[in-house]
């Protein structure tokens, strides 16, 4: 009996080796997946194998579905629900305890395109911010560096937040648009997240629901609510994009979608691009103090429709005036001849004054990448009827060297000549663009920061309602605050 046991025990390694060899040399899903991984890693430079991006790449491939050969992000929310259910079941078992987590904190946020002061906070200190990869957050006292940001929900089906607004008729109602359209192009660093539509809260952000009618809107570039004779009307910029060679087309089309029933139904309001059967793709929506709606455009997937400003008092189909003079001006340029993105900023204290930033770019013949700069800054003194050029910040078009990505403007609440713009850094003009002050320096991040440090790439500039001094800035490094925006050097 003892000899049989010894013999059986000695055969165990042989059996295990055979199983390993069978698994190794049997063609199948595992082998195909190994070949897929080898192919992917072979294209990655490995000079620094312990660098953060290599760790992130490893984490990425650990979550790839071998059959799909991509990360099935559409399953994330279901996986979260399953994990939560298992944890709840575990809590009922004898001796089990819930997992406890301790927040470690961070002194830098990620790319933040959506920034909003909370209209319901009597103290005027609460703010909201949306990250393009990190979801929606709020801070009960954004004026204090010690006040922590709180996540709304880490497990929304989509954490790519691009824009946010509230209803001026009912400030308890908030809207959040998902999907980051401005990087959803063939560019040197594709980093776009496809959206799932528009989220809505009717209790000042305590709870949220996804509006079912918007689930085919792939990218929401901007969202505003207008008070139309005491009724709330939503305007959403809906566009399409491309990510890693795959086009994500919003349905039924790009355009400015209008809803007068809280988002239950929508109508596309913009005209078609000149010479096309597709509506303009909105990059920015601006509502002036008298209610006039302005829309700045961006290129669509067909590379059409950029560098255009539209305005309307009614906001409905057939009511729009189109200003596209700068298409021909840009196309006549020797280098930066592709009409780009348009950003708008109206003066709260003077409905006649509106500013427009217009980008212009080119497409690389060698890579196919889209590039764009800050082509022009315009001002209108008659509510968009006519426009004239102002000076650009020092350095010309390079002040906004990534205007497809980082491009923003804001006008002081009480001075129509005081204008902030943002590209790579923050700039300010106190005389309607005649001259400019360079206020921030992103490179100070390498030297410990300081009072002039704001992270690179400006995406949001928001004054607190009625205050010319308090202002929030959204950038690739999170949210920055100043309490003296009206000074020469905040």
State what each model feature region is.
Residues 2-490:
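Extracellular glycan-interacting surfaces
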